[in-house]
Amino acid sequence: MTPPPPKRQKRDEYRKATAEAASQPGPSDVAEIKLPKKKYYRQRAHANPFSDHHLNYPLSPAHMDWSSHYPAFVDPDPSHTNLAGARKLLKDVEVVDIGCGFGGLLIGLAPLLPESLIVGMEIRVSVLEYVTTRIQALRAQQLKLRAATAAATAASETPSQQQAQIDGKQANANAAADAASPVLSTDTEHTPTTLVPGSYENISAIRSNTMKFFPNFFARHQLSKIFICFPDPHFKARKHKARIISETLNAEYAYALRPGGLLYTITDVEEYHHWILRHFGVESGAEEESEEKSTSANANANANAGVRELFERVSEEELEKDECVRVMKEATEEGKKVARNKGNKYVAVFRRKTDPEWPA
């Protein structure tokens, strides 16, 4: 049997060693806990959402086991289990990043929303493995920092040490405030030196095909925020059916999003931005593409009319005050690449309206 190429062997060995180091209570020095490197997690840019991937998904949201993803939020009462027999959490997942990629948005939102459970959904295997390993390493680093901080606090006895402790606490508080700001460094080679709110215990990632199984994970009105950042534009007309924004999927997002919840979108493709606006009923007068039939256009118009009753676009004034928008622009890997290339970023955020009343 022919062995795999040397590069593949090197990648597999690195990924295995990195995953083991991140998941085990290893070195005492924070600097020794390394974050994974992207070059060892090669993955194609696309995955066909219509293929029958080997995926694990719950029968319903009540069957989903979140305990392994958020161990710090597991209900201490072992008798509190869901329909699948898994331990329940103290709170529900309420923020979702659809197509989380390499996890830049998750890392940026973690200290900004320390009391909210955030999950990223990704269909590509290697990318998900990278994100999972990255989160485990960040949690391990925070654990070591907490232990080092506690030891330093206990060791301070003399007045000079107490004064140094006070100064150190003030410095840590300022650093933590900086860490909680939305402009975060997501360089995988960076080793944090301060504690961040939440210690990255509130983020995780799962492998899932959102186009098929989104309602299997989230109950009605469970979510407060949905992020769709730099989705695959699928430029060819015959590929438009694979876009993550459509009438059908928008209805599923509205089902899981609670009234007042926000759906964030950002793209660097202007045509796709207008597609998003049309499918949320904002650009109702836009002409459909020439190759589409009139019957399909009429059906889309009717669907958009229904979406218009469920979503309203958030004004630019509100977006300027929303810290999540800043993170979405600056913390994601695609956002950084667009900034390096001096490209444009098109943002549209939609608020979930209250469900319309049934006619009498």
UniProtKB/Swiss-Prot annotation:
Molecular-function GO term, any one: tRNA binding
Catalysis performed (reactions): guanosine(46) in tRNA + S-adenosyl-L-methionine = N(7)-methylguanosine(46) in tRNA + S-adenosyl-L-homocysteine
Subcellular localization: Nucleus
Alphabetized UniProt keyword annotations: Methyltransferase, Nucleus, RNA-binding, S-adenosyl-L-methionine, Transferase, tRNA processing, tRNA-binding
Catalytic residues identified in the record: 232
Subunit organization: Forms a complex with trm82.
Described purpose of this protein according to its UniProt entry: Catalyzes the formation of N(7)-methylguanine at position 46 (m7G46) in tRNA.
Protein name: tRNA (guanine-N(7)-)-methyltransferase
Organism: Neosartorya fischeri (strain ATCC 1020 / DSM 3700 / CBS 544.65 / FGSC A1164 / JCM 1740 / NRRL 181 / WB 181)
